A protein has these predicted regions:
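Negatively charged, low-complexity tracts enriched in Asp/Glu with abundant Ser/Thr
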Residues: 1-24, 45-47, 73-76
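Generic detector of bulky aromatic hydrophobic side chains
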Residues: 30-32, 72-75
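A short, charged, amphipathic alpha-helix used as a generic interaction element across diverse proteins
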Residues: 44, 52-71
Length: 76
């Protein structure tokens, strides 16, 4: 992690790595999904939060765990 990294970068290093190197995340409501957060890459959606995940902190923790595994499997 770069020196002077923010609290977000320390709490969610795989989310940061994802958006800097592999894809992007979308947050909020849209017309196509009822999820709160989605992770995408060039091929499309790779993950979306469950409808019943109501807190952003819980969703980001779940996304962090998913991206840690995905980055290890596909990009390591």
């Amino acid at each position: 992690m770069p020196q002077g990294a923010s609290g977000f970068e320390h709490m969610y290093p795989h989310i940061v790595r994802w958006v800097q190197s592999y894809g992007w995340i979308e947050m909020g409501a849209d017309h196509y999904s009822r999820s709160l957060v989605r992770a995408l890459d060039e091929g499309g959606m790779v993950w979306e939060s469950k409808e019943d995940d109501t807190t952003l902190d819980k969703v980001l923790q779940t996304l962090e765990a998913f991206l840690a595994q995905r980055i290890q499997e596909y990009y390591a």
